[in-house]
A protein has these predicted regions:
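Structured mid-domain segments that build the active-site/substrate or prosthetic-cofactor binding neighborhood
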Residues: 1-140
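Acidic, low-complexity N-terminal propeptides/linkers enriched in Ser/Thr/Asp/Gly that mediate export
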Residues: 115-177
C-alpha cells in the first residue's frame, strides 16, 4: 500500500514509510514491484528494531522459569527460554503475514494495468481510494484475476517471489539469541 501511496498512510496522510514517486507515473509492473520491495525492506528493518527491543526486554524483565524448567534444552543448558536456552526461539518473532493478499493485489495490477491494459494505474488507485464504489465493473475484473491458493502459476510465481524476498530480507538480520 505504501508503494501506491508515496509512502504515506491512507488513514492520516502522514509520511510513515519511504517517500515514493507518484504511483500514477509508474510505467511498468517492475517499477511497482521495486517500490514494493523498497517499502518492504524499510518496514522489515524497523520491525526488526522493535523485535530486538522486545526480545531484550523479555530477557531482562520477563523470564519464564516454569516454562524453562519444562524444556529439556533449557534444563540442559541452564538457561531461561528468553535467554536463548531453548533449541528454538519462543520470544517475539518476525512472521510474514499478508502473502496471499499482496500476491493477489500485484496479480491484479500486473494483469489489468500492464498486460491487458484494460485500466490505468490511476483508475485502479482511484477505485481503491473509493473502496470500489462506482467502480463495480472494475472490481469484477479484479476479482476474475487468478488468486493465490488455486494452484495457478500466474499468481503463485508472484507469491514465490514475495516469499523469497521476505526470507532473504528477514534472515539478513539476527535476533539476540
Amino acid at each position: 500500500e505504501f508503494a501506491l501511496n508515496e509512502g504515506k498512510s491512507r488513514l492520516t496522510g502522514e509520511q510513515v514509510a519511504l517517500p515514493e514517486k507518484d504511483p500514477k507515473t509508474f510505467t511498468s509492473y517492475e517499477e511497482i514491484e521495486a517500490a514494493l520491495f523498497r517499502q518492504f525492506s524499510y518496514m522489515v528493518k524497523h520491525g526488526v528494531i522493535s523485535l530486538l527491543t522486545a526480545q531484550k526486554i523479555h530477557k531482562e524483565q520477563a523470564p519464564r522459569p516454569f516454562l524453562s524448567a519444562c524444556n529439556e534444552y533449557c534444563v540442559k543448558n541452564g538457561k531461561d527460554l528468553v535467554d536463548g536456552g531453548a533449541k528454538y526461539n519462543i520470544g517475539p518473532v518476525f512472521t510474514g503475514v499478508g502473502l496471499s493478499v499482496t500476491a493477489n493485489s500485484l496479480a491484479v495490477i500486473k494483469k489489468l494495468v500492464f498486460e491487458e491494459k484494460s485500466v490505468t494505474l490511476s483508475e485502479l488507485i482511484d477505485a481503491l481510494n473509493h473502496n470500489w464504489e462506482g467502480y463495480e465493473a472494475l472490481r469484477a475484473k479484479a476479482q476474475a484475476v487468478p488468486k493465490y491458493g488455486n494452484d495457478d502459476d500466474y499468481v503463485d510465481s508472484i507469491a514465490k517471489k514475495l516469499a523469497d524476498y521476505f526470507y532473504h530480507d528477514v534472515t539478513a538480520y539476527k535476533d539476540i539469541y
